[in-house]
Amino acid sequence: MKPQFITLDGIDGAGKSTNLAVIKAWFERRGLPVLFTREPGGTPVGEALREILLNPETKAGLRAETLMMFAARMQHIEDVILPALSDGIHVVSDRFTDATFAYQGGGRGMPSEDIEILEHWVQGGLRPDLTLLLDVPLEVSMARIGQTREKDRFEQEQADFFMRVRSVYLNRAAACPERYAVIDSNLGLDEVRNSIEKVLDGHFGC
């Protein structure tokens, strides 16, 4: 099997941070070479843009925000993702372009056609081989976000914003079931872990 590009995505409060540890443990047990990274971020340029994008004090228009996301992504692809894949290393990214369709598209209202143009220009033919989409009901997401001490620029949004974000994620997953695995992360930790491990086992033929 060629090196796999796997993404982990979902609305805020879906438990990505917790379940990244599950994925790391899965790769470690099998001794598979893997690189973990994140978006926006993953490079010095990307991390600098992340600081701007998540800062609650940032006043950026929709197009500027979207372009910053893709600028960080282009650097990420060129400097991190493609080199790792070329070296035979699997890549797991905490968020990727699905998040742009969901947050800037669904949440903010950026036309999906414009995002698709940028996606093609920045990524070429690069697409994830597998996307683990962590999903929780809106009220669970909002409750978990409410427990965050310092909310970033996106976490400060209201429930209707996250309702639109979640809807886009689920619609994209339904339209491409061969790539997406929707994980109910409202279940207990053991059940979520088992679900993720089952998907990875199936994808890698373990």
From Swiss-Prot:
BP terms from Gene Ontology: dTDP biosynthetic process; dTTP biosynthetic process; dUDP biosynthetic process
EC identifiers of the protein: 2.7.4.9
This protein's record includes keyword Zinc: no
Reactions mediated catalytically: dTMP + ATP = dTDP + ADP
HAMAP family the UniProt entry points to: Thymidylate_kinase
Role of this protein: Phosphorylation of dTMP to form dTDP in both de novo and salvage pathways of dTTP synthesis.
Protein name as catalogued: Thymidylate kinase
Native species: Neisseria meningitidis serogroup C / serotype 2a (strain ATCC 700532 / DSM 15464 / FAM18)
Lineage, top ranks: Bacteria, Pseudomonadati, Pseudomonadota, Betaproteobacteria, Neisseriales
Gene of this entry: tmk
